[in-house]
């Protein structure tokens, strides 16, 4: 029996075309507060395509390229589209009768929609309680003290403001998330910055977000080594030798070649895919569901090693690191200290001519790699630092409470949608009569 499949090129083109519409809708809503039903139909068509006969009941979609057929899990893509279409359809309907953006948002009941569409029944049952807790935390954050200074909000992306996705290349932010993030950032913070480990482009956070890249939220990649600020890319390459930067660029071109060979083509969609960062390449070698045959994964890693040897035959500039069973990294030998997200925060503050010592500072994250951001903020502003962390275990919670020094200034939630729902409630409550 022949299994129906879609080409990798068609799959990505379908989703990327839809994402451009999401970006336009978000920009339009942030500017005018209005959309029409006709403008959101591409989301409906994309959702229908993602759920056609090429996708099983368990979100497994069959993809082909150059004679090879493989399966990928598109649960995040489908669930994001479902929630987005429901929200935007309701919002467009309210635009026909309601005059204010706030009333439209209120009548759409985004918190209720998100609660009813959680994949985990445990999240669904406790969703409203978590949203109330998160809202209280955020209301305290944005309450302006006598100094009149709005807070600074610095956040990780994947797992914190955006659900994890099996394919980094199609880890696309829904419009509902972008809209409430954008309005919250614009109205209640002096700066709202995303600091992610992934790259800015090809693909990167600037391609995957639905927010306008020169809008109310700032974006960085490579642990804050590269920022999109003032309409341009600002790079902090301290400690990275020029020869190493050249070598990593050459290796990226080499890997682009082997990903166009039939045998390894699926690795463009496996986990991290191929991410070119300032000082390294991150390569996905296995999915979280173990869908790649072990022999093929090992063969791909060998091919990567062979290309490293071509570019750097004497191992002067590049080093291969096995990060996890899911990905490997090829890093540039650095002559300086190891860069972390705390350094990225310092780079942002310096560029903006801001200070962590001013006002309240909230750091949001979901893993230990986000702790350096919190530590940096706590060192500079120990009495006003706050932490919002997503789906972390008790041990990490304890570490966070120790860094902050006051559990009343920490908040732990189960998923990014809790924060989105809390943003929506605050926008409605504080702008109702504005």
From Swiss-Prot:
Keywords: Hydrolase, Magnesium, Metal-binding
List of residues binding substrate: 275-277
Co-factor requirement: Mg(2+)
Active site: 158 (proton donor/acceptor)
UniProt cofactor note: Binds 1 Mg(2+) ion per subunit.
One family name in Pfam for this protein: T6PP_N
Binding residues annotated for Mg(2+), in chain numbering: 156, 158, 366
First-tier enzyme category under EC: hydrolase
Magnesium found in the keyword field: yes
GO MF annotations, alphabetized: metal ion binding; trehalose-phosphatase activity
Enzyme Commission designation: 3.1.3.12
BP terms from Gene Ontology: carbohydrate derivative catabolic process; dephosphorylation
InterPro entries linked to this entry: HAD-like_sf, HAD_sf, T6PP_C, T6PP_helical
Catalytic activity: alpha,alpha-trehalose 6-phosphate + H2O = alpha,alpha-trehalose + phosphate
Domain of life according to the entry: Eukaryota
Described function: Catalyzes the hydrolysis of trehalose 6-phosphate to trehalose and phosphate; prevents the accumulation of toxic levels of trehalose 6-phosphate.
Family: Belongs to the gob-1 trehalose phosphatase family.
Protein name: Trehalose-phosphatase
């Amino acid at each position: 029996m022949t299994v129906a499949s879609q080409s990798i090129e068609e799959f990505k083109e379908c989703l990327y075309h839809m994402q451009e519409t999401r970006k336009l809708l978000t920009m339009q809503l942030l500017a005018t507060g209005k959309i029409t039903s006709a403008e959101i139909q591409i989301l409906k068509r994309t959702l229908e395509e993602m759920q056609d006969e090429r996708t099983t009941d368990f979100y497994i979609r069959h993809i082909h390229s150059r004679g090879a057929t493989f399966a990928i899990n598109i649960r995040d893509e489908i669930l994001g589209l479902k929630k987005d279409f429901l929200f935007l359809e309701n919002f467009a309907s309210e635009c026909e009768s309601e005059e204010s953006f706030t009333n439209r948002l209120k009548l759409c009941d985004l918190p209720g929609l998100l609660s009813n569409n959680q994949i985990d029944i445990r999240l669904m049952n406790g969703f409203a309680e978590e949203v109330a807790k998160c809202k209280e935390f955020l209301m305290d954050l944005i309450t302006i003290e006598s100094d009149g200074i709005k807070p600074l909000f610095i956040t990780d992306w994947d797992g914190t403001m955006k659900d994890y996705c099996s394919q980094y290349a199609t880890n696309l932010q829904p419009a509902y998330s972008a809209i409430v993030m954008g309005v919250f950032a614009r109205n209640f913070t002096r700066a709202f910055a995303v600091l992610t480990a992934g790259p800015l482009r090809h693909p990167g956070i600037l391609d995957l977000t639905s927010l306008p890249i020169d809008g109310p939220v700032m974006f960085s990649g490579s642990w804050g080594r590269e920022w999109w600020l003032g309409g341009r890319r600002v790079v902090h390459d301290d400690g990275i030798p020029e020869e190493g930067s050249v070598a990593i660029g050459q290796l990226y071109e080499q890997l682009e070649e082997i990903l166009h060979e039939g045998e390894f083509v699926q690795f463009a969609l496996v986990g991290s895919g191929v991410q070119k960062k300032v000082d390294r390449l991150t390569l996905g070698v296995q999915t979280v569901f173990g869908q790649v045959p072990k022999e093929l994964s090992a063969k791909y890693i060998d091919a990567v090693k062979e290309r490293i040897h071509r570019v750097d035959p004497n191992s002067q500039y590049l080093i291969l690191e096995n990060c996890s069973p899911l990905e490997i990294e090829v890093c540039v030998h650095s002559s300086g200290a190891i860069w972390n997200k705390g350094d990225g925060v310092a780079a942002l503050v310096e560029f903006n001519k801001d200070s962590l010592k001013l006002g309240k500072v909230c750091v949001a994250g979901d893993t230990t790699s986000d702790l350096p951001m919190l530590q940096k903020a706590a060192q500079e502003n120990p009495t006003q630092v706050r932490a919002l962390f997503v789906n972390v275990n008790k041990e990490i919670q304890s570490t966070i409470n120790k860094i902050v020094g006051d559990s009343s200034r920490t908040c732990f939630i189960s998923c990014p949608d809790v924060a989105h729902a809390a943003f929506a409630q605050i926008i409605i409550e504080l702008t109702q009569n504005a």
